[in-house]
Amino acid sequence: MNIHQDVVDEQLRMGRVRRVADVTVYWLGQGSFTHEEALSIIEHARGEILTLCPGKEEVFELVIRPRFLRILTERALIEWGATDSVN
């Protein structure tokens, strides 16, 4: 492959990673799931993302998983009515 094709392939992979992350964010924020089901969705997204980007487990754990977990935390606070006491 030439450098141009490598760049195009990388851009396509990153676009797919973004879509997986965006869909996961949407599901976690809007779907009706138990906590265990939500964690399963996160693990599924992790598998998809690491298939696209092998060897990037640390990046997932440091950047992407916290984003997903933050959504679950915010949603739980809203559902429990705890946001009034936090804000």
Segments predicted by a language model, with ranges:
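Helix-rich interaction surfaces within compact, conserved domain-sized segments
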Residues: 44, 48-87
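Helix-centric, low-specificity signal for extended rod-like, repetitive segments
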Residues: 6-12, 39, 60, 68
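N-terminal acidic leader/helix
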Residues: 2-35
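Short linear, low-complexity motifs centered on an aromatic residue
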Residues: 7, 35-50
